């Protein structure tokens, strides 16, 4: 069954109200608001997609300095929001009955969430409310191997990963990547190391019978379809090698 990975609206996940060019104008009063999360995202997504809902991702946009200095408050807000989401899924609204395999995931755009004093608390919040961490392969974040320790804190659990922007382009490199890679018909910046790490996580997750949901952007390597094909081929090759080595 084809499953969709759906990202929550900025109304809920961006701490700032932004102008047309993306510049922050003022604080967003709806940031991580529990009611908005359920009413504007979780419920309509599940009611619209049903069993095709794979993962609902709350991608927290880059935080301004005053929020980065108040990370415990951010985590408390996140906890309250995820609690409301879980209540909507499993409580009186019973939304999960329409999408029994849906995964709730949180993605971030600040390495501060991976700090030694913050990461354990983030993992605790996610575990408490039945959510997982979405691996964010993006130039704003550390490479995949630096994010895996957080995923290990949640193990065993489903995998959600979004490959967005090759690290070579820097934190604001979307337009540069688009200009370089169009018409997105070939891989121009292969990232075999990331692919190898991701392959291992996919196989370990699937071996536990858990969902492994991965999306890849054209700006990750140059061509999303070819990146997906290369990842699938590596997964298949590792499986074939393991089958060859196993006793008959």
Where are these regions (language model features)?
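Residues lining hydrophobic/aromatic ligand-binding pockets adjacent to catalytic sites
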Residues: 1-248
